[in-house]
């Protein structure tokens, strides 16, 4: 005798039907787990690779290196224990100029105090200029910072700018003015902020 009413909306699995389907179900679960593992391990290795590429931020804090009389407007910088609190991590010094090895956004800062400076100043001091720029490669040559001393004995400048691998930063001070050798009065630095 047939049953009356609505038939059941779902299929009832018999034990033998489940036994036939479970290997396929197990295969789907295995493939899903494998894909998730492969995807996540790829992401982790990329993050680990980034950490290895940038174990610490690229930064440099430099002191003036006046070992010979100035014959051109270029200021030469140095770093290391012999020059006090100066260092380079990432960028390197090349003939007193700073070479960048990592593309990214950098914070540049410089302060130069004139040696034997008097507050009223001379006409030359009023016109004196401190400039920081990219001097190499020549195709990228550009002035990044520029400031006049005017009536002051000190100029301090800073800015954020994008620099690329191979950029060489140069600093110029109007001749024949001499910068102070005091590390608290004359210094130059860069700090890598982000890619």
Swiss-Prot record:
Domain (THD) ranges: 58-193
PROSITE patterns recorded: THD_2
Protein topology in the membrane: Single-pass type II membrane protein
The answer to whether the entry has keyword Repeat is no
Which InterPro entries does this one have? CD70, TNF_dom, Tumour_necrosis_fac-like_dom
Write out the topological domains of type Cytoplasmic.
1-23
Induction per the UniProt record: By IL-2 and concanavalin A (Con A).
- Annotated keywords: Cell membrane, Disulfide bond, Glycoprotein, Membrane, Signal-anchor, Transmembrane, Transmembrane helix
- Record-annotated disulphide pairs: 117-153, 135-170
This entry carries the following GO cellular component terms, namely: plasma membrane
Its quaternary organisation is: Homotrimer.
Q: What is this protein called?
A: CD70 antigen
Species of the source? Mus musculus
Upper taxonomic classification of the species?
Answer: Eukaryota, Metazoa, Chordata, Craniata, Vertebrata
């Amino acid at each position: 005798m047939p049953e009356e009413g609505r038939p059941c909306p779902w299929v009832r699995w018999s034990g033998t039907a489940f036994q036939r389907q479970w290997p396929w179900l197990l295969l789907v679960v295995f493939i899903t787990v494998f894909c998730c593992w492969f995807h996540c391990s790829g992401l982790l290795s990329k993050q680990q690779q980034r950490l290895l590429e940038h174990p610490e931020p690229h930064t440099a804090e430099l002191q003036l290196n006046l070992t010979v009389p100035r014959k051109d407007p270029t200021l030469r910088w140095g770093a290391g224990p012999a020059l006090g609190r100066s260092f380079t991590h990432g960028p390197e010094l090349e003939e007193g100029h700073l070479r960048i090895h990592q593309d990214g956004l950098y914070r540049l800062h410089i302060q130069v105090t004139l040696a034997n400076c008097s507050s009223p100043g001379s006409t030359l001091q009023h016109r004196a200029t401190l400039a920081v720029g990219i001097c190499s490669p020549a195709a990228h040559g550009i002035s990044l910072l520029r400031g006049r001393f005017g009536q002051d004995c000190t100029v301090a400048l800073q800015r954020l700018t994008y620099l690329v691998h191979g950029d060489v930063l140069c600093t110029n001070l109007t001749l024949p003015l001499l910068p102070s050798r005091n590390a608290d009065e004359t210094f130059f630095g860069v700090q890598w902020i982000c890619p």
